[in-house]
């Protein structure tokens, strides 16, 4: 078995550190085409855990799963030119099949609003029942100019939900409800604190009336848009001529939403929590919660028996585990466990067997605990809960300590230069946002709501024009 290579430190080269971690921890291999990856079993298990948790919420909300075509016809594209303009540079087009040119181009979905609009039109014409709430777990393809494993892939996995409603208010409220769930999911399961808000006109989803986002801070202080929900209004319904009959039997145009999260959350978990030794998983999303390491088990069968006893206790407690019963050296086993990020490791040697004792080590802070095996279930559960809480607390402190409020463009530029998240009073045009991006590299992440956990003043003077505004916008460099 190959010895784990040394991981580049975060301070030396954060981008190289990230790639070192995800490759050495066996999350992925690079695919044969730019921007594609092979999901290895550990990497895919993270996604399976995400799917399980998120899907359970969808079931409670009476959102049903479907699967729609990968291919989009040309006439759909022509109906929604404004929507497609946002994806034009990334849109993959099929022009030829088997050496024969197609009469009309076929497009590979970058997202599925067009397909859902077509589906909704047929279903409403048939049944006239609203709302319809659907979701699909699928892959999409976008020919990204700059790629980064998990964070920005040419092909990636995601869920995209789509609903259609009779009422504008109901549709917009549903989009906000999903955005609140995304915030809850990231904070309570992934231990990633987020800043939520509404996208600016320049940054909102093409074809949306409003886009609601959750933004996370990585360890290098860059923002990651982690999930979004869109109120689409009647934009797609009008272009696809979708109508329903109201109580007065009059034809009305309904309102739509779309919302999604993707495998970029795997990258977020790595970038928020991991260290120079490798992965650190929050227990609630960890593929393996406990690594059981056998020492000298080849010469001492009692170590193996003790490991199986521990495994049985963990299994009954519904705590996931893996036993390392290889004949590798102790240092290798410990290092390998560190790289792969299980929240807890249990080290078993002849001494532990002799004393009927557990040696438990936390992955996040390397704190050691010694206790009788009879306490394993209770102790393990408690420590896993504490790790989950501590990881969130650490990330929340990082977010708060590195988010600053500014009142002038000079303060703004200096704060961005210092790699801060910046909150500024801002009521300027999209052209001003573009100017900021060109000058500083920062983009508007979201307009903060009045109930934000940041103590915002009622009004401020916009940093460019000086005009009084009640709008405060979060800016940051981002992925």
UniProtKB/Swiss-Prot annotation:
- EC class of the enzyme, as a word: ligase
Question: Its catalytic activity?
Answer: tRNA(Pro) + L-proline + ATP = L-prolyl-tRNA(Pro) + AMP + diphosphate
Q: Give one GO biological process term.
A: prolyl-tRNA aminoacylation
SUPFAM superfamilies linked: C-terminal domain of ProRS (SSF64586), Class II aaRS ABD-related (SSF52954), Class II aaRS and biotin synthetases (SSF55681)
Query: Which of UniProt's keywords are assigned here?
Result: Aminoacyl-tRNA synthetase, ATP-binding, Cytoplasm, Ligase, Nucleotide-binding, Protein biosynthesis
Report the transmembrane regions from the record: none
MF terms (GO), sorted A to Z: ATP binding; proline-tRNA ligase activity
> Could you name the Gene Ontology cellular component terms for this entry?
aminoacyl-tRNA synthetase multienzyme complex; cytoplasm
Q: Which Pfam families match?
A: HGTP_anticodon (PF03129), ProRS-C_1 (PF09180), tRNA-synt_2b (PF00587)
| Primary location recorded for the protein, binned into one broad class | cytoplasm
Record flagged with keyword Transmembrane helix: no
Cell compartment(s), UniProt: Cytoplasm
What InterPro entries does the annotation carry? aa-tRNA-synt_IIb, aa-tRNA-synth_II, aa-tRNA-synth_II/BPL/LPL, Anticodon-bd, Anticodon-bd_dom_sf, Pro-tRNA-ligase_IIa, Pro-tRNA-ligase_IIa_arc-type, Pro-tRNA_ligase_II_C
Which family does the entry's similarity section mention? Belongs to the class-II aminoacyl-tRNA synthetase family. ProS type 3 subfamily.
Complexes and interactors: Homodimer.
Quote the entry's note on domains.
Answer: Consists of three domains: the N-terminal catalytic domain, the anticodon-binding domain and the C-terminal extension.
Role played: Catalyzes the attachment of proline to tRNA(Pro) in a two-step reaction: proline is first activated by ATP to form Pro-AMP and then transferred to the acceptor end of tRNA(Pro).
PANTHER family from the UniProt entry: BIFUNCTIONAL GLUTAMATE_PROLINE--TRNA LIGASE, PROLYL-TRNA SYNTHETASE
Q: What is this protein called?
A: Proline--tRNA ligase
Organism for this UniProt entry: Mesomycoplasma hyopneumoniae (strain J / ATCC 25934 / NCTC 10110) (Mycoplasma hyopneumoniae)
Encoding gene, per UniProt annotation: proS
């Amino acid at each position: 078995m190959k010895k784990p290579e040394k991981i580049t430190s975060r301070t030396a080269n954060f981008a190289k550190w990230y790639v070192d971690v995800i490759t050495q921890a066996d999350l992925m291999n690079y695919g044969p085409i730019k921007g594609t990856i092979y999901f290895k079993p550990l990497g895919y298990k993270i996604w399976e855990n995400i799917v399980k948790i998120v899907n359970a919420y969808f079931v409670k909300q009476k959102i049903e799963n479907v699967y729609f075509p990968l291919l989009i016809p040309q006439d759909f594209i022509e109906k929604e030119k404004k929507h497609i303009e946002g994806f034009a540079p990334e849109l993959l087009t099929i022009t030829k099949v088997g050496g024969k040119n197609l009469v009309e181009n076929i497009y590979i979905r970058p997202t599925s609003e067009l397909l859902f609009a077509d589906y909704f039109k047929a279903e409403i014409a048939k049944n006239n029942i609203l709302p319809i709430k659907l979701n699909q777990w699928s892959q999409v393809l976008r020919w990204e100019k700059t790629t980064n494993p998990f964070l920005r892939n040419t092909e990636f996995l995601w869920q995209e939900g789509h609903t259609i409603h009779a009422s504008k208010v109901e549709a917009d409220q549903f989009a906000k409800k999903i955005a609140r769930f995304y915030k809850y999911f990231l904070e309570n399961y992934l231990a990633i604190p987020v800043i939520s808000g509404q996208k600016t006109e320049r940054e909102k989803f093409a074809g949306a009336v409003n886009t609601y986002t959750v933004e996370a801070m990585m360890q290098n202080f860059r923002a990651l848009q982690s999930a979004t929900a869109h109120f689409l209004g009647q934009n797609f319904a009008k272009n696809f001529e979708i109508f329903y009959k109201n109580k007065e039997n009059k034809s009305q145009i309904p309102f739509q939403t779309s919302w999604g999260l993707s495998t970029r959350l795997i990258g977020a978990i790595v970038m928020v929590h991991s260290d120079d030794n490798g992965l650190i998983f929050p227990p609630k999303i960890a593929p393996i919660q406990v690594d059981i390491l056998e020492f000298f088990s080849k010469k001492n069968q009692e170590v193996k028996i003790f490991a199986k006893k521990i495994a049985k206790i963990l299994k009954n407690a519904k705590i996931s585990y893996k036993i390392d019963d290889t004949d590798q050296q102790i240092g290798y086993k410990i290092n390998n466990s560190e790289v792969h990020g299980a929240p807890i490791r249990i080290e078993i040697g002849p001494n532990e067997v002799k004393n009927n004792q557990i040696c438990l080590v936390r992955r996040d802070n390397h704190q050691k605990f010694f206790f009788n095996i009879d306490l394993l279930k209770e102790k393990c559960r408690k420590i896993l809960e504490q790790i989950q809480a501590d990881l969130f607390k650490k990330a929340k402190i990082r977010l708060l300590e590195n988010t600053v409020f500014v009142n002038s463009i000079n303060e703004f530029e200096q704060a961005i230069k210092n790699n801060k998240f910046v909150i500024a009073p801002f009521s300027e045009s999209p052209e001003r946002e573009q100017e900021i991006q060109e000058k500083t590299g920062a983009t508007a992440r979201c307009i903060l709501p009045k109930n934000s956990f940041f103590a915002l003043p009622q009004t401020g003077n916009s940093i460019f024009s000086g005009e009084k505004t009640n709008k405060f916008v979060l800016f940051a460099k981002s992925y």
